């Protein structure tokens, strides 16, 4: 089971379904605001989704705020290195807002308050190399995702889905030891906004403990800079302290927590927003 992707008007995109019990407005175009707001209300009335979650340009946020949406995060200079992006939410189910994972939130607050150790990982990485993945490897990629995630907000366990994403400006990268794929991740590139979401990190159980996510992230950053990308961001699991550490160590800024937002590994989890501005090389 996976959620549905809908395209609205001149380029707006939403994802919705019972898997995450939410609507996610992934992309908003100015001319589509009336149609998008109407569709969000229609889905709320028909499907009774517990949460509406929207990424919108700051200049287009007022109609959402007037309808009861609240800010949960933001990325400054997200759109072409100029305009801020706001992440706005409306909780139709009060319990989804109030039942916060207090233990996980406290662990993360402690992480933010402590100095991070910058460990030398070169010895761990000596046997690994990074390269961009190809369609012919989609089945192997899907197997690792299925091993790592019981459930995921997108059907990354499906090789056909991975191949389709490769055709739509999603770049997958793999860490190899010899010919064996040990870990992988993706960069979802939006050339219109000059941004990329660094996501879909997974490590085969036989290769954990080598900080391969950090190696992958560093390699993806270099690749994105070569493609003219200015803003990198991720939506990381609040519960995954190692993943949060990875982004903090590489200089990403924490910028908000999305409460009870995404179904991963069989349950609805809260997610942290991180971003980093980089100097595009072209």
Predicted regions located by residue number:
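A short beta-loop-alpha structural element at the N-terminal edge
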Residues: 126-141
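Short, cationic low-complexity segments
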Residues: 103-129
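Conserved beta-strand-loop-alpha-helix junction that forms the acyl-donor binding cleft
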Residues: 53-61, 234-244, 261-264
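Conserved catalytic-core motifs of GNAT/GCN5-like acyltransferases
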Residues: 55, 70-86, 253-268
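Conserved GNAT acetyl-CoA-binding A-motif
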Residues: 44-56, 224-236
């Amino acid at each position: 089971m996976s959620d549905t992707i809908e395209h609205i008007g001149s380029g707006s995109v939403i994802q919705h379904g019972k898997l995450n019990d939410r609507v996610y407005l992934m992309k908003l175009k100015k001319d589509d605001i009336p149609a998008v707001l109407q569709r969000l209300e229609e889905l709320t009335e028909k499907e009774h989704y517990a949460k509406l979650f929207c990424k919108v340009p700051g200049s287009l946020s007022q109609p959402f705020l007037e309808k009861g949406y609240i800010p949960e995060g933001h990325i400054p200079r997200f759109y072409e290195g100029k305009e801020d992006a706001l992440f706005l939410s409306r909780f139709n189910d009060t319990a989804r807002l109030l039942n916060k994972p207090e233990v996980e939130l406290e662990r993360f607050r402690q992480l933010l308050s402590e100095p991070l150790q910058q460990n030398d990982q070169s010895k761990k990485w000596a046997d690994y190399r990074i390269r961009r993945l190809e369609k012919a490897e989609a089945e192997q990629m899907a197997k690792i995702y299925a091993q790592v995630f019981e459930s995921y907000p997108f059907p990354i366990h499906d090789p056909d889905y991975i191949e389709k994403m490769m055709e739509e400006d999603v770049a997958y990268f793999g860490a190899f030891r010899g010919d064996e794929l040990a870990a992988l991740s993706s960069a979802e590139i939006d050339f219109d906004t000059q941004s990329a979401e660094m996501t879909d990190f997974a490590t085969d159980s036989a290769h954990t403990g080598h900080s391969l996510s950090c190696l992958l992230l560093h390699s993806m950053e270099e690749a994105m800079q070569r493609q003219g990308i200015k803003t990198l961001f991720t939506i990381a699991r609040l519960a995954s302290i190692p993943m949060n550490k990875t982004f903090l160590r590489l200089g990403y800024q924490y910028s908000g927590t999305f409460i009870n937002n995404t179904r991963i590994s069989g349950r609805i989890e809260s997610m942290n927003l991180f971003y980093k501005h980089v100097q595009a090389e072209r």
